[in-house]
């Protein structure tokens, strides 16, 4: 964004401050205070530096106005105040003498805009220095995920052993063995880490803020490519009028340096195999929601991994080459989420298959997704962005205007063929730019799956200039016009995925999975009282399956307290909890009904 000049007239002369419209107005005031302090006039020609009583500093749009305290502009940007290049503001303040002290004031502040409007803000001003007021407004008070709270307390420093270059004892430290920050570029390249972790990126931004010595401002600010249809800066709303305040800036797309989630782990291989079996039996594709939890990933500094404990398959119509999602009853989906939350699980992503038999009769499948074709199609990228917008990440370091939301931890996993014909999962997210492009309705799919089409402007959508930037083989940055299409890979963020060497899943056995009635074979029964009876008879006290719990809740035989007893037993696997469950009235009623139904 281009720089602008704001003019400030005071009793010690006029001062010009160069800034840009996205800057926090507090940074402008800090520059102004520094110039006022160095003016050396003080109104009496004694040549000494001004000593400003910061509590008396007010800003107005007219020379006669008393104006408002500077404190009240602390959390607003130049753009939000409606200030334009060349605007004149009038500064009033008192000089501090050696025997004078701070005073408490309650003032009214107004600033003039390019259109002659004023912005009134009222309120009492505390008698503390301006820097203290600004820095006291730190991170938001929002409820973050436990993993974010845990990683926020860690420094993430990468320890290094003594090297041959060290010239000191075991208790010494030098540049060759001192810890590295978690965002270190050389470490990332040496360990083949494609993206730094979200918390490494966050700490890098906080470090930049700290080293600048400026006031606190949120280091996470989601991009917004939408035009402001409510802009009233002296013109009619778009499309009948437009100005630099309401229109989005030109967009430059580049590969995102960080990722919100670094790794996707399936708690046990049978979770994925059970999902893929639908294709093995029927040849049609399948879609599911990943329910799991977040934990630290040891492979990446300050990394996060999503551990999948179960897959829920909503109502859908499956075909050989596609999937159509049907309406999922909201009450049922809410019930699934609530039960999952009692296990400390959330929706962490989606999963779908894209498998085609290779015809070799040895279990191999076609490899359709690779660097010369695509990893996710344009429609899949847009779908992933919509899911990420639906399930936002909450961070106290984001802005209040976004309610603490910044990007998402929601993962998209596709099961497809590898280079050697093996079936393998591949996990992705899309960038914050992709989320903003979809939210602003700027992009859509096209006939070439690897390319994304840029929409045209219309009465409700303004599409700015869009470029995408990449590094060529000579190490130089090259920018290309993104219209009408650009490669979808510029919106992708890739994750790693795996299975644990020593699985410890919450749910350890199998049960009939819902919404698979169309399979109709002996290995895929429909959920019924008979399947409940057979499951309980064959497993005794080993009733550790999420789909079993959901089916049991749908029968409405057990009350809420008895369902909680069942969940507590599955979590603890304690025999005492099991005895409490089987001795309950609801469980005995269930056994009676099942015995009579056989």
From Swiss-Prot:
<dbReference type="GO" id="GO:1990116">
    <property type="term" value="P:ribosome-associated ubiquitin-dependent protein catabolic process"/>
</dbReference>
<feature type="compositionally biased region" description="Low complexity">
    <location>
        <begin position="99"/>
        <end position="118"/>
    </location>
</feature>
<dbReference type="GO" id="GO:1900182">
    <property type="term" value="P:positive regulation of protein localization to nucleus"/>
</dbReference>
<dbReference type="InterPro" id="IPR037518">
    <property type="entry name" value="MPN"/>
</dbReference>
<keyword id="KW-0811">Translocation</keyword>
<dbReference type="GO" id="GO:0030894">
    <property type="term" value="C:replisome"/>
</dbReference>
<dbReference type="GO" id="GO:0034098">
    <property type="term" value="C:VCP-NPL4-UFD1 AAA ATPase complex"/>
</dbReference>
<dbReference type="InterPro" id="IPR029071">
    <property type="entry name" value="Ubiquitin-like_domsf"/>
</dbReference>
<dbReference type="GO" id="GO:0051028">
    <property type="term" value="P:mRNA transport"/>
</dbReference>
<comment type="similarity">
    <text>Belongs to the NPL4 family.</text>
</comment>
<comment type="function">
    <text>Involved in the import of nuclear-targeted proteins into the nucleus and the export of poly(A) RNA out of the nucleus. Has a role in the endoplasmic reticulum-associated degradation (ERAD) pathway.</text>
</comment>
<keyword id="KW-0509">mRNA transport</keyword>
<dbReference type="GO" id="GO:0006511">
    <property type="term" value="P:ubiquitin-dependent protein catabolic process"/>
</dbReference>
<dbReference type="GO" id="GO:0070651">
    <property type="term" value="P:nonfunctional rRNA decay"/>
</dbReference>
<dbReference type="Pfam" id="PF05021">
    <property type="entry name" value="NPL4"/>
</dbReference>
<feature type="region of interest" description="Disordered">
    <location>
        <begin position="99"/>
        <end position="119"/>
    </location>
</feature>
<dbReference type="GO" id="GO:0099638">
    <property type="term" value="P:endosome to plasma membrane protein transport"/>
</dbReference>
<keyword id="KW-0653">Protein transport</keyword>
<keyword id="KW-0963">Cytoplasm</keyword>
<dbReference type="GO" id="GO:0036435">
    <property type="term" value="F:K48-linked polyubiquitin modification-dependent protein binding"/>
</dbReference>
<dbReference type="Pfam" id="PF05020">
    <property type="entry name" value="zf-NPL4"/>
</dbReference>
<protein>
    <recommendedName>
        <fullName>Nuclear protein localization protein 4</fullName>
    </recommendedName>
</protein>
<dbReference type="GO" id="GO:0072671">
    <property type="term" value="P:mitochondria-associated ubiquitin-dependent protein catabolic process"/>
</dbReference>
<dbReference type="GO" id="GO:0030970">
    <property type="term" value="P:retrograde protein transport, ER to cytosol"/>
</dbReference>
<dbReference type="InterPro" id="IPR016563">
    <property type="entry name" value="Npl4"/>
</dbReference>
<dbReference type="GO" id="GO:0071629">
    <property type="term" value="P:cytoplasm protein quality control by the ubiquitin-proteasome system"/>
</dbReference>
<dbReference type="GO" id="GO:0051228">
    <property type="term" value="P:mitotic spindle disassembly"/>
</dbReference>
<feature type="domain" description="MPN">
    <location>
        <begin position="264"/>
        <end position="403"/>
    </location>
</feature>
<dbReference type="GO" id="GO:0036266">
    <property type="term" value="C:Cdc48p-Npl4p-Vms1p AAA ATPase complex"/>
</dbReference>
<keyword id="KW-0813">Transport</keyword>
<dbReference type="GO" id="GO:1990112">
    <property type="term" value="C:RQC complex"/>
</dbReference>
<keyword id="KW-0256">Endoplasmic reticulum</keyword>
<dbReference type="GO" id="GO:0048471">
    <property type="term" value="C:perinuclear region of cytoplasm"/>
</dbReference>
<dbReference type="GO" id="GO:0043130">
    <property type="term" value="F:ubiquitin binding"/>
</dbReference>
<dbReference type="GO" id="GO:0005634">
    <property type="term" value="C:nucleus"/>
</dbReference>
<keyword id="KW-0539">Nucleus</keyword>
<dbReference type="GO" id="GO:0000837">
    <property type="term" value="C:Doa10p ubiquitin ligase complex"/>
</dbReference>
<dbReference type="GO" id="GO:0000839">
    <property type="term" value="C:Hrd1p ubiquitin ligase ERAD-L complex"/>
</dbReference>
<dbReference type="GO" id="GO:0031625">
    <property type="term" value="F:ubiquitin protein ligase binding"/>
</dbReference>
<dbReference type="InterPro" id="IPR007717">
    <property type="entry name" value="NPL4_C"/>
</dbReference>
<dbReference type="GO" id="GO:0006274">
    <property type="term" value="P:DNA replication termination"/>
</dbReference>
<dbReference type="InterPro" id="IPR007716">
    <property type="entry name" value="NPL4_Zn-bd_put"/>
</dbReference>
